[in-house]
């Protein structure tokens, strides 16, 4: 069976597409604004036509439309930045209409959709994306409303929030999934699975302290400052060092660092990993510290954030992934934090062609 050709907009580094080779979809062209991310995408997918440019510009849209037509692309994958209005106020009709639609990048995808004949369209983002309001026809609407107004005659429009932890991924990471597919075609939702606790996912890897490395690729610990390491050594699994009475996070001058209850916090072994954000390399950010294990001296091991290997595993990224040689730890963590876990993308896309009844 021939593969469905697809184009990808707002593709970033292509993390979300890493497992699409296991599906019936082949991404033939992609667009990304930022050169470093576009270069990483080209590194991962040398056979895909990556166009680095601004999708709000006519020339970029025209390039992607031409590429879609050239390759006979029948699918669009779009992961636009989450931009919109979170509230409208009481007098929605009186709100000034944004004349510059470039502030709402998802609307730029409409020009591509209108000029191509896609069978399937996948739009994914953070859950709040479904609650945002966007300017349309001199008013403001949620995206699902706009899609129905514009495309209901041609497409079935469905939207759900799926959490990666329910689909074979050891990470609690909710993502908004919007599917459009032509009337007469089929596209089921993926079937939920048992949660995977962190122990089962990364518990086999050797313990590491701040700055230590191993002979396992990507399994090396970031260097953290001694004050924070000391505080976390005295912080049990699942707890935050912020709550410690003696060994709490301190500034250089010794004063206590104030923070939320989920900062400087260790994860739980018996639960999926918390969401990996773009700040997963910082112990001071939310829920980022390795669970650790109780040591004979009463302290806890692994006073550090997850290694890149551990981050790959809980993000469903292949352990043998080959990032460009000049990729920094921060860059890798950032593009992972921006992306849908690739296994969740795969699970959604592999249901193309299946009827809804099969997965109920």
Regions found by a protein language model. Name each.
Residues 2-116, 126-134, 138-140, 145:
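Core alpha/beta nucleotide-donor-binding catalytic domains of modification enzymes
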